[in-house]
């Protein structure tokens, strides 16, 4: 069975009707704010893509995609997306988006190998976004400015939610704190990556951890990243590797850190080749997506994903993501959650 994290003195603040209304309020308001902040146009996204083109997101490189044959294509295999990280960049080229503008989608995915708990579901829904940037924007300072604008949109949505439902009290700090994964390692050398995230988030409330995917000074990664979307190997102006990271907050309902978004400046030709070599995946250079990038047919970009159910869960102060979205959960998990006051949909 999956793991259940026991909430801290949990009592739902909204009934089922209020919860459904709150979900709609948050989703409508946040996506409007996000699109305005980053100048994004909504586009329609696929649920599945053809296998073998290198378009699907490999996540950490070990997760199996849900696959099925297509009769009218001679049983060619399609994969349900894990995310749209690479598809979005292809779409930027197709739509001929100018620098400073971008796209966002309502992304729905199935991650069959997900380890289920209060935050992780088989079903993933997120706002996947991607924007065209200039060569001179491939800097840490630019990345930070985008993170701050996204965080501002999150806080505005928290304010509206608390105004609509006065029983919900705001808890997000005014500012988000930035730290590199290697600096975090040096602060807490005896802790695991997850324990380091908990410690820094409890200290600052909201944190952006920079440089996830490359090896740190101890020879280990903070967390895995595929080599062909985020740039985690370029040395930034701070002298450290990585132009990507995660937005995390301290979530008092569960007494732990909580990831809301993974994002970053995307690989250019040089960093793609470098990261494929580091990961021993040079054979991927021949795939469709990679050839498009290596032959200068794709724009430079920045992008990421923001969990829809996760954001709703946090802003509505829910103890389990299954209180926000409909998915499949082990019977034992449903029973244990009910014992703690969490009624899964």
Segments and roles (model prediction):
Residues 2-120, 128-132:
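Class II aminoacyl-tRNA synthetase-like tRNA-binding/catalytic domains
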Residues 43, 52-56, 168-181, 330:
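N-terminal pre-domains immediately preceding structured catalytic cores
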Residues 23-26, 30, 34, 68, ...:
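Generic structural hydrophobic/aromatic packing signal, biased to beta-strands
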Residues 34-42, 150-161, 319:
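A generic secondary-structure signal for well-formed alpha-helical elements
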Residues 105-199:
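Extended, charged alpha-beta segments that form solvent-exposed binding/catalytic grooves
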Residues 21-25, 29, 138-145, 288, ...:
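Generic recognition of stable, solvent-exposed alpha-helical segments in well-folded globular domains
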């Amino acid at each position: 069975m999956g793991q259940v994290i026991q909430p801290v003195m949990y009592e739902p603040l909204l009934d089922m009707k209020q919860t459904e209304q709150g979900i709609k309020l948050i989703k409508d308001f946040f996506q409007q704010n996000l699109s305005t902040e980053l100048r994004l146009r909504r586009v329609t996204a696929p649920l599945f893509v053809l296998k073998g083109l290198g378009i699907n997101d490999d996540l950490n490189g070990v997760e199996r995609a849900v696959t099925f044959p297509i009769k009218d294509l001679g049983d060619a295999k399609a994969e349900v997306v894990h995310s749209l990280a690479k598809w979005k960049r292809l779409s930027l080229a197709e739509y001929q988006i100018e620098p400073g503008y971008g796209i966002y989608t309502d992304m729905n995915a199935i991650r069959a190998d997900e380890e289920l708990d209060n935050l992780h579901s088989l079903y993933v829904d997120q706002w996947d976004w991607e924007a065209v940037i200039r060569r001179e924007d491939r800097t840490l300072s630019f990345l930070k400015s985008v993170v701050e604008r996204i965080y501002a949109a999150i806080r505005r949505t928290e304010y509206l939610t608390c105004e609509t439902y006065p029983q919900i009290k705001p808890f997000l700090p005014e500012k988000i704190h930035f730290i590199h994964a290697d600096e975090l390692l040096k602060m807490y050398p005896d802790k695991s990556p997850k324990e380091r995230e908990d410690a820094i988030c409890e200290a600052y409330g909201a944190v952006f951890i920079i440089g996830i995917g490359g090896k740190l000074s101890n020879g280990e990664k903070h967390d895995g990243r595929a080599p062909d979307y985020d740039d985690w190997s370029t040395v930034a102006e701070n002298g450290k590797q990585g132009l990507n990271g995660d937005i995390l907050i301290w979530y008092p309902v569960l007494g732990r850190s909580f990831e809301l978004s993974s994002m970053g400046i995307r690989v250019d030709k040089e960093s793609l080749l470098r990261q494929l070599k580091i990961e021993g995946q040079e054979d991927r250079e021949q795939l469709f997506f990679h050839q498009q990038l290596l032959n200068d047919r794709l724009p430079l970009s920045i992008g990421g994903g923001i969990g829809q159910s996760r954001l709703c869960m946090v802003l509505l102060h829910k103890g389990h993501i299954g209180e926000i979205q409909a998915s499949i959960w082990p019977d034992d998990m449903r029973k244990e959650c009910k014992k703690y006051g969490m009624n899964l949909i």
